[in-house]
Regions:
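Short glycine-rich anion-binding loops that position phosphate/pyrophosphate groups of nucleotides
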Residues: 100-102, 187-191
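N-terminal active-site beta-alpha-beta segment that forms phosphate/nucleotide-binding
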Residues: 2-65, 70-177
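Conserved alpha/beta enzyme-core scaffold
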Residues: 120, 182-184
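Short Gly/Thr/Asp-enriched flexible loops that form oxyanion-binding sites at enzyme active sites
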Residues: 105-111, 193-207
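Aromatic side chains
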Residues: 88, 97, 122, 189, ...
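Surface-exposed, charge/polar-rich loops and edge strands
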Residues: 2-13, 17-27, 166-182, 191-194, ...
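Generic detector of intrinsically disordered, low-complexity, polar/charged segments
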Residues: 68, 92, 190, 194-198, ...
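Conserved residues at the C-terminal ends of beta-strands
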Residues: 97, 185, 244
Length: 244
């Protein structure tokens, strides 16, 4: 019987190939729909107070296996009560990511968040010596709208960059507990909200450092949904997954 790591490796190969096979026009359309739902959930109704995230009822048809459906899958394992939500008197901060290859692209949501007055941060990978010292494989850096095209960690998202190698005034480091929301990439997911990443452990390390009030949302295409995602003890389910 295959061990968990082999199962994960095989599933990554299958799902990425399936994702890559989607026509570019379809990926663009799906990403636009995902960004629309992200905007609705995080910008229009920051903590979805009109819905019961702890129930099995989905907000739309997200449990359908049809690739034309879209929806929000609330995990039954990690609800975040509305009475714990932080005040939004200050500028809110959301972490997103720069899409690579055929990934669902949150760029349109990032623009909408900036226009709504949110601060937007992107992951910056850290070199191995700094990983050992801080326990994180990445940090989050704020990027202004007019700086996005020049940010080296956006142009090359997997490139490790020392935390002191970049101008901290231009790209300020944001601690995990400052994030009000985080948009998480994934390779595969299931109905329980289990996420399969790329195997580097970046988000497995980062997610536990977030504030309890941070709203965590994974995004993906419906083609990335599987009946069961293999998992280890260190893997995390996501409270919400938006798919299209």
């Amino acid at each position: 019987m295959e061990d968990i790591s082999e199962q994960k490796r095989a599933l990554r190969h299958i799902v990425i190939a399936r994702r890559d096979a989607l026509p570019i026009e379809e990926r663009v359309h799906k990403s636009a729909e995902i960004c629309r739902q992200l905007k609705q959930e995080l910008l229009d109704d920051p903590f979805n107070t009109s819905s019961d995230a702890s129930s099995d009822t989905v907000l739309t048809s997200s449990l359908s296996t049809s690739s034309s459906s879209s929806g929000i899958l609330p995990s039954t394992q990690q609800s975040r009560p509305s009475d714990q939500h932080r005040s939004f008197d200050r500028a809110k901060t959301v972490g997103v990511y720069a899409a690579m290859g055929s990934e669902a692209d949150p760029a349109a949501f990032a623009i909408a968040a900036e226009q709504a007055g949110w601060r937007v941060a992107y992951p910056c990978m850290l070199p191995s010596d700094e990983v050992e010292s801080c326990g994180q494989r990445m940090c989050m850096r704020l990027v202004a709208a007019n700086e996005r095209q020049d940010a080296p960690f956006i142009l090359r998202p997997t490139r490790p960059i020392s935390i002191n190698a970049l101008d901290r005034e231009r790209y300020p480091v944001v601690s995990a507990n400052e994030l009000d929301a985080l948009v998480v990439p994934l390779v595969a997911f299931d109905a329980d909200g289990m996420r399969l990443g790329y195997g580097g452990g970046c988000y497995d390390c980062f997610l536990p450092a977030l504030a309890p009030t941070c709203k965590i949302v994974g995004i993906a295409y419906e083609e990335q949904r599987f009946e069961r995602v293999p998992s280890d003890a260190h893997d995390h389910t996501l409270p919400y997954i938006i798919s299209a």
